[in-house]
């Protein structure tokens, strides 16, 4: 089964209170956190969408997001991060490592 999913996330302040949303033709999800960042909310929306797809046994999914951070992270940076033990090229920990690992695990199921 093929599935299109639309996600978004935002925060008021960075950090600040934030929320995320997921919309598809078969489900809608939303949530938030009191003290978070825009990027974490963008990623949480995608993470929740992937969790729902796994739960519903949806094998192919196309996720639409306006976040260049997430797009580049998933399509370009994540391969290098994994190879480097979740460290950047400068040797520091990848920001939002916990969410990147969860997203990577789910997208490979």
Model-predicted segments: where are they?
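A short, polar/acidic, helix/strand-boundary loop motif
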Residues: 25-42
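A broad, low-specificity signal marking well-ordered, structured residues that form hydrophobic/aromatic
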Residues: 5, 20, 29
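Acidic, metal-ligating active-site segments
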Residues: 17-24
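RNase H catalytic domain
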Residues: 4-17, 47-109
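Post-transcriptional modification and biogenesis factors for structured RNAs
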Residues: 1
């Amino acid at each position: 089964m093929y599935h299109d999913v639309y996600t978004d996330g935002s925060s008021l302040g960075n950090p600040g209170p934030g929320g995320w949303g997921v919309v598809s033709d078969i489900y809608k999800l939303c949530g938030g956190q009191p003290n978070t960042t825009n990027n974490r909310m963008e990623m949480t929306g995608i993470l929740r969408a992937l969790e729902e797809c796994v739960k519903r046994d949806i094998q192919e999914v196309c996720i639409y997001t306006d976040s260049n951070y997430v797009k580049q992270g998933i399509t370009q940076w994540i391969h290098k991060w994994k190879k480097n033990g979740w460290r950047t090229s400068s040797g520091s920990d990848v920001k939002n490592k916990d969410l990147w690992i969860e997203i990577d695990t789910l997208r490979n199921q």
